[in-house]
Amino acid sequence: MIRVAINGYGRIGRSILRAVYESAKRDRIQIVAINELAKPEAMLHLTQYDTTHGRFHTQVKLDEQHMIIGDDAIKLLHEPNPANLPWQEMDIDIVFEATGVINDRQACEAHIEAGARQVLISHPSSSDVDATIVYGVNQDLLKAEHTIVSNASCTTNCIVPVIDVLDRHFQVKSGAITTIHSAMNDQQVIDAYHDDLRRTRAAGQSIIPVDTKLARGIERILPHMKDKFEAISVRVPTINVTAIDLSVTLDKRVDIEQVNRVLKQATEGSFSGVVGYTNEPLVSCDFNHDPRSSIVDGTQTRVSDGHLVKLLLWCDNEWGFANRMLDTSLEMIKARRA
C-alpha cells in the first residue's frame, strides 16, 4: 500500500480520488491527505456531486478535520505554502501535484523538503524534472532516484501511444494535429477579461482557438520525432471528452485495413487497457468516464495516396488522465523499491 496526498482538489484532483475508489487499485493506493484552499463544505459537495461524472458511489461526509469515505479518514489541509505541509509526519510516498500552477522542479521540491518521497505532476512541466512519462510508452525510464516526475498532458497521453504504434510498423515521417478539446475552467462563462483575447469570449458560444505545446510534448516522449509534428487546438462548447484529428505521412505504403488492423492489435496486446479501438458509430459523450488514454475510431480512418493517413482519436481528458496518474504512481514506487 502506498500513501499519497493530493495537492490541489480541482477537476483532476477530484478525478484522481474518484479513480482510486472506483478501481482495483484501491488496495494498493491510500489517499492520506488533500491540501486545498477551498472550504471543506465545498470540497465535500463537489466530491459527492459531479456534473460530468455523476454522484459519488460511496457515502462521503466531514468531521472537524477529515473527509470520511467509507472507513477512510482523509485529512483536509488548507496550506498555501507546500513547504509547510506535514508530509513527513504523514509518511507520504507520493504527492499528486494537481494545482495546475506548480510545474517546475524548484516549486515541486517544496513537497520533498516537507517530507514527501516523490512528486507526480498532473500536467506538463519544465524540462528539469527527472522524467516525463506517458504510461504504456516510456514508464521503463523511471529510476529509483527519480523524485519529481511529470505525467505529461491528457492530449499527449492520447496521441503518443498511437504515434508510437504507427512509427514502429510504418515509420512516421511527419504529422499535423488538431485537438478538439472540451471547454476548461480557464475560459469565461460570459465575455470577461483574460490575457488571451480569444479566451475573453464566452466558452459556451464559440469554437475558440488556443495555444498548444502538444507537438513539443510529443518530442519529449519520442525524441526522434523532433520537428516532425505541428499542432493546433480549439476549445468547443462541451464540458468533457476530447477528439484529436491526427494526420501523419508514413514512409511505407498502407491502406485503411492495414492501419486499422495494426492499431486494433496494439489495443489487444501491449496497449491493452491504455488504448482502445471501436468501429461503432459513437459520439463524444459515449467516451465520458472512459479510463483509457485513447480510443481509435476505426470508422474515421482515411488514407490518401497510400502514405497520408488521417485518424480520429477520442479520450476523456479528465478520467483517462486521472487513471494514468494512478498507473504512473505505481510504476514510480516499483522503480524506487526495485
Swiss-Prot record:
CDD domains given for it?
GAPDH_C_E4PDH, GAPDH_N_E4PDH
Pathway the protein takes part in: Cofactor biosynthesis; pyridoxine 5'-phosphate biosynthesis; pyridoxine 5'-phosphate from D-erythrose 4-phosphate: step 1/5
**Which residues are responsible for catalysis?**
154 (nucleophile)
Give the CC-aspect GO terms.
Answer: cytoplasm
Predominant location: cytoplasm
**Site positions per UniProt: Activates thiol group during catalysis:** 181
Q: Where along the chain is NAD(+) bound? A: 11-12, 317
- What catalytic activity does the UniProt entry give for this protein? D-erythrose 4-phosphate + NAD(+) + H2O = 4-phospho-D-erythronate + NADH + 2 H(+)
Q: Which residues bind substrate?
A: 153-155, 199, 212-213, 235
Q: Which PROSITE patterns match?
A: GAPDH
Q: Which keywords fit this entry according to its UniProt record? A: Cytoplasm, NAD, Oxidoreductase, Pyridoxine biosynthesis
Could you tell me which cysteines form disulfide bridges? none
Where does the record place it?
Answer: Cytoplasm
Enzyme Commission number:
1.2.1.72
One GO BP on record is: pyridoxal phosphate biosynthetic process
GO terms, molecular function: erythrose-4-phosphate dehydrogenase activity; NAD binding; NADP binding
Q: How does it assemble?
A: Homotetramer.
Function description: Catalyzes the NAD-dependent conversion of D-erythrose 4-phosphate to 4-phosphoerythronate.
Q: Which family does the record claim for this protein?
A: Belongs to the glyceraldehyde-3-phosphate dehydrogenase family. Epd subfamily.
Q: What is this protein called?
A: D-erythrose-4-phosphate dehydrogenase
- What is the protein's species of origin? Shewanella piezotolerans (strain WP3 / JCM 13877)
Gene name in the database record = epd
